[in-house]
Amino acid sequence: GLTIPSVTAQAELMRAVLTLSGLDPDDVDFIEAHGTGTPVGDPVEAASIGTVYGTGRQQPIPISSVKANFGHLEPASGMAGLITAILSLKKADLPPMPLDFTPNPHIDFQKLNIVCAAAGMSLRDADVHTAGVNSFGFGGVNAHLIVQTLKQPVTDRDQTAQILPPLLLSARSDAALRDLAASYADYWESAEPSYYEMAYTAA
């Protein structure tokens, strides 16, 4: 049967995930909300986010939901939210929602200390950015995860491995293989790419 969302259950899960991550609520830059789009679901989710991430925070925590742009997607909605959160972290920017988007009037954003990033927004200037992602289901699925950027990107100079990974190339003939190897050599000399990234892509 269908289940009714619970502020308590959602908030308990968020706190548990924060504890496992070793993070404080203030460490999280934004929440990619599930965004059920229902009169009951959205206020419950907003209340749980405000309870955990909004309480005691100096600035309201931004919330967004990519599903406002193209619908719910049913079983794939969680993956859409995760992908959006990762891209938002990479670009340090939250995407805008549709121009006609209107926040749920039953949500007291000021009291919960949350803000709807409907117009899009840039993340605060920091070495590390962190996002929380919600995903719920009709059958009672209650999921919350935290994703975070790396403090420093890994470069060739940072690599400590003494053995380089193989550069795997394949072709249908010896001549084609030689041509492919030559093209990689030309690319290596002209673009100066990361060998590790090139080997990973080729594999």
Give the residues covered by each predicted segment.
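Condensing-enzyme catalytic core of the thiolase-fold
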Residues: 1-169, 175, 179, 190, ...
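Conserved short hydrophobic interaction patches
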Residues: 183-187
